[in-house]
Amino acid sequence: MTLQQQIIKALGSKPQINAEEEIRRSVDFLKSYLQTYPFIKSLVLGISGGQDSTLAGKLCQMAINELRQETGNESLQFIAVRLPYGVQADEQDCQDAIAFIQPDRVLTVNIKGAVLASEQALREADIELSDFVRGNEKARERMKAQYSIAGMTSGVVVGTDHAAEAITGFFTKYGDGGTDINPLYRLNKRQGKQLLAALACPEHLYKKAPTADLEDDRPSLPDEVALGVTYDNIDDYLEGKNVPQQVARTIENWYLKTEHKRRPPITVFDDFWKK
């Protein structure tokens, strides 16, 4: 088995999907989890205005709507959380995503004060954060806020991780990568677009250039620039297609060096890191 085949198997990717079937699969997955653990009353998700959180948010609200109708349990809710750092450049996209999702509840937590306070506390301990590490600080502060909200609403935190993100480890460890449940896991980037198109999402929300937008020195840096490969390259690779050798090498290098991000903390029983 080639490394490409191993990766595809590990991430559960498929070369082709039926958008309606995958929508139903994700919604039923969320519903089943909530029904298995009836003490869970809310799904909590940060909404950025990008493709992934827009899709995950819509699926969450669909699952909650169906469960409320089927069970009569009005205590169930989906909480969309806006988590800007100061003023967000694409704020209108965030509002458009909220309008599309129609969440039960919308909360806004501006993380800038908390990030600056943390940075100052570290500075007083003689630790000066680089711009890149400050970006990770933002991602972790966003997740901390979501877990606080989940803790106070008997909820779980929903993630937006998908195959095209997981393969490159393009997430912050214990930031956006630290979640309870990931309904998009298995899908690549273009497949996520297919689901949003089937859900009649405004096109500009999934046709925009994806960006984590964490670095102050490089605002709105496109993911594809940071990664050195395009999402079309990554999606082709995940669909088992032939890609240029240098592209495959770049993707596989990302996969191998970020393996620790896809695993629980390393213990004496692990040996993957020795290979």
From Swiss-Prot:
It catalyses: deamido-NAD(+) + NH4(+) + ATP = AMP + diphosphate + NAD(+) + H(+). Pathway: Cofactor biosynthesis; NAD(+) biosynthesis; NAD(+) from deamido-NAD(+) (ammonia route): step 1/1. ATP binds at residues 46-53, 160, 189, 211. It is an enzyme of class 6 (ligase). Deamido-NAD(+) binds at residues 140, 173, 180, 260-261. GO terms for cellular component: cytoplasm. Keywords: ATP-binding, Ligase, Magnesium, Metal-binding, NAD, Nucleotide-binding. One of its GO terms (molecular function) is metal ion binding. SUPFAM superfamilies: Adenine nucleotide alpha hydrolases-like. The keyword Magnesium applies. It holds the Pfam family NAD_synthase. Belongs to the NAD synthetase family. Homodimer. NCBIfam families: nadE, PRK00768.1. This is NH(3)-dependent NAD(+) synthetase. It comes from Shigella boydii serotype 18 (strain CDC 3083-94 / BS512).
